[in-house]
């Protein structure tokens, strides 16, 4: 699960490597690239109550540099990018991989994975609000008269960002990498130009200052860590977007551009404050001369929009994974590109994110206030990923327990300290990401649990398919009439006679010439090769069982898959084929195994789920739905 996961990388030309690395700069590093706008400013606040000292400034920059080194470089760039699921990364991808080898603690792993996904979705709300606000706030330095318009301008920018999602971003996405690369170069140049303000800032490379500061400051040191962590927000994107770019391009972009640019910019901000303590109110923008402020604000706004776009796209992708893995109900998914199936738009998710983002902007009003709420979701997601990575190296790489503990325990402890520091901000807005993540976790856990209970209940009343076929194939005077054509019955249980088939016989008293029992199954791999897509079993002269396999990153286009299946010899004409779907009317039961409120939530989610004929892209004029009541 390392080099072999991206075999094409071995033969990647320098030109392709360059363009993939450039593309990753915009998508993968957009979020972490906006952190200099506010991270150092926020870290200064807890220690600036009685004036900031030289030791404190150098120590804060030291903490930031070493946070980037340990958490981003060592954990993500060098380690986690190798822990992939057939080339794909991300929390749910890692969960899908671990579910194959989980021994006795599946529920714990699943809950951890769902928490990580929920925290990421919370991050997808906070990132656009914080990033755009922090960029637009630079207008205050251009002219103070614009101070009252920062929130309205931010709302307009964010509204436009969410409105254009339905049209896709393929046409402009090719500019994301170059624009963000320019952003990093501008930040690096600003940092270099100010390091000469006080070369003493270079002492920040010595970890002594970071450690001594924490030991000296005590409680204030812990508080500061919450702000220092803003330096590494966005690191999860490195892992989540692994499948889009591959390991080597992401690593090259980090070491050759992103890491040096971030380090130089933070050093420049530190030297600026050492040379002029009055600049600590906004050290990022005050690095630039007056004439450059407006262009930098415009560039910063573009960079934050790109970062926000990357997070929103990541949320869409994660939701699709969640649906395919059975953690979320079916939702309408629109494809915004004819050639790239990864470019999707999920209207319901877009609406939820938009409402949440606007609420955050209007509620917090400034990036200062919102930054206090930001760290919890990110640190929480990182802790979850580290714990799951521990399980990964034990199960997949066969590391011994002592080796795994020695390698990963320090990272987990460090991230737990960061999480504890961020939890101190609960009363200042830190409760917001906790509430968002809790809500998403409850929804996903309820859907998974409710679906399992429903399948277990229906299995007790279902008729085994083999018995049904054996009975129906016996010729008698009571045999149903046979009609020409093909009937395809969708079912989640290939071993039982589908409810739609039984209802069709009960009400219409007919059986088609050819009857296909179709099951759609998502496997714990991102993609399925076309030659492994289907499994066909002929049960009798008139009945066959077909299983279509999809990866959790794939669109479940059943019509297209069946068209391919015809080439193997399964004869049917799509225009003389009817698709029979069962539609269940769920009724809550006091003995369901879930609390009553959870029953109600599950039923509400089921009722809101997208129509299966739309989700599976079945021809609308060939679909027949037959309903039934089911007590859950």
Curated annotation (Swiss-Prot):
- InterPro entries under this entry? K+_transporter, K_trans_C, K_trans_N, Kup
The membrane-topology field of this record reads: Multi-pass membrane protein
Reactions catalysed, semicolon-separated, are: K(+)(in) + H(+)(in) = K(+)(out) + H(+)(out)
* Compartments, as annotated in UniProt: Cell inner membrane
Name the domain of life this protein comes from: Bacteria
Question: Which keywords does the record carry?
Answer: Cell inner membrane, Cell membrane, Ion transport, Membrane, Potassium, Potassium transport, Symport, Transmembrane, Transmembrane helix, Transport
**So where does this one cross the membrane?**
17-37, 60-80, 106-126, 146-166, 175-195, 210-230, 254-274, 292-312, 344-364, 370-390, 401-421, 426-446
Q: Name one GO molecular function term.
A: potassium ion transmembrane transporter activity
Gene Ontology CC: one annotated term: plasma membrane
One Pfam family of this protein, by short name? K_trans_C
Q: What does this protein do?
A: Transport of potassium into the cell. Likely operates as a K(+):H(+) symporter.
The similarity annotation says:
Belongs to the HAK/KUP transporter (TC 2.A.72) family.
Q: What is this protein called?
A: Probable potassium transport system protein Kup 1
Origin organism of this chain? Rhizobium johnstonii (strain DSM 114642 / LMG 32736 / 3841) (Rhizobium leguminosarum bv. viciae)
């Amino acid at each position: 699960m390392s080099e072999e996961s991206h075999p094409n990388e071995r033969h990647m030309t320098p030109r392709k490597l360059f363009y993939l690395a450039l593309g990753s700069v915009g998508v993968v590093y957009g979020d972490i690239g906006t952190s200099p706008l506010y991270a150092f400013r926020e870290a200064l606040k807890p220690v600036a109550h009685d004036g900031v000292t030289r030791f404190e400034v150098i120590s804060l920059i030291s903490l930031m540099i070493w946070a980037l080194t340990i958490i981003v470089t060592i954990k993500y760039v060098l380690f986690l990018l190798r822990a992939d699921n057939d080339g794909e990364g991300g929390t749910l991808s890692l969960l899908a991989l671990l579910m194959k080898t989980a021994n006795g603690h599946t529920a714990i792993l699943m809950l951890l994975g769902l928490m990580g996904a929920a925290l990421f979705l919370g991050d997808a709300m906070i990132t656009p609000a914080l990033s755009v606000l922090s960029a637009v706030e630079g207008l205050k330095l251009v002219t103070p008269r614009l101070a009252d318009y920062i929130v309205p301008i931010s709302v307009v920018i964010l509204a436009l960002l969410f409105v254009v999602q339905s049209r896709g971003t393929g046409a402009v996405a090719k500019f994301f990498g170059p624009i963000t690369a320019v952003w990093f170069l501008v930040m690096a140049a600003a940092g270099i130009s100010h390091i000469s303000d006080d070369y003493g800032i270079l002492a920040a490379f010595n970890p002594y200052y970071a450690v001594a500061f924490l030991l000296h400051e005590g409680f204030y040191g812990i508080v500061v860590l919450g702000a220092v962590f803003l330096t590494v927000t966005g690191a999860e994107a490195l892992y989540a977007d692994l499948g889009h770019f591959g390991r080597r391009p992401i690593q090259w972009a980090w070491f050759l551009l992103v890491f040096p640019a971030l380090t130089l910019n933070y050093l420049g901000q530190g030297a600026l404050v050492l040379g002029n303590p009055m600049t600590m109110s906004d050290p990022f923008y005050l690095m630039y001369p007056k004439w450059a402020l407006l262009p930098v604000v415009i560039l910063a706004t573009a960079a934050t929009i790109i970062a926000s776009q990357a997070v929103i796209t990541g949320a869409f992708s994660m939701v699709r994974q969640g649906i395919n893995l059975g953690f979320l109900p079916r939702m309408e998914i629109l494809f915004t590109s004819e050639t790239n199936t990864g470019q999707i738009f999920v209207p319901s998710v877009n609406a939820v994110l938009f409402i949440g983002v606007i609420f955050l902007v209007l509620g917090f009003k400034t990036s200062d206030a919102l930054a206090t709420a930001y760290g919890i979701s990110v640190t929480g997601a990182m802790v979850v990923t580290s714990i799951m990575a521990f399980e990964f190296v034990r199960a997949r790489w066969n590391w011994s327990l002592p080796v795994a503990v020695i390698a990963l325990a320090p990272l987990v402890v460090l991230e737990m300290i960061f999480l504890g520091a961020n939890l101190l901000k609960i009363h200042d807005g830190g409760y917001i990401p906790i509430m968002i993540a809790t809500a998403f976790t409850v929804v996903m856990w309820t859907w998974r649990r409710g679906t399992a209970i429903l399948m277990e209940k229906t299995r007790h009343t279902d008729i085994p398919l083999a018995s049904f076929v054996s009975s129906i194939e016996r010729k008698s005077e009571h045999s149903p009439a046979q009609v020409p054509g093909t009937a395809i019955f969708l079912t989640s249980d290939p071993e039982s006679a589908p409810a739609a088939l039984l209802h069709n016989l009960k009400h219409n008293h007919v059986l088609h010439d050819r009857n296909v029992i179709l099951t759609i199954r998502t496997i714990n791999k991102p993609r399925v090769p076309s030659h492994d897509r289907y499994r066909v079993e002929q049960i009798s002269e008139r009945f066959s069982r077909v299983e279509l396999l999809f990866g959790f990153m794939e669109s479940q286009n059943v019509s297209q898959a069946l068209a391919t299946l015809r080439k193997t010899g399964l004869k049917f004409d799509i225009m003389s084929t009817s698709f029979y779907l069962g539609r269940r009317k769920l009724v809550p039961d006091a003995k369901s195994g879930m609390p009553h409120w959870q029953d109600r939530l599950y039923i509400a989610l089921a009722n809101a789920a997208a129509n299966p004929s739309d989700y599976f892209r079945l021809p609308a004029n060939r679909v027949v739905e037959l309903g039934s009541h089911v007590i859950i």
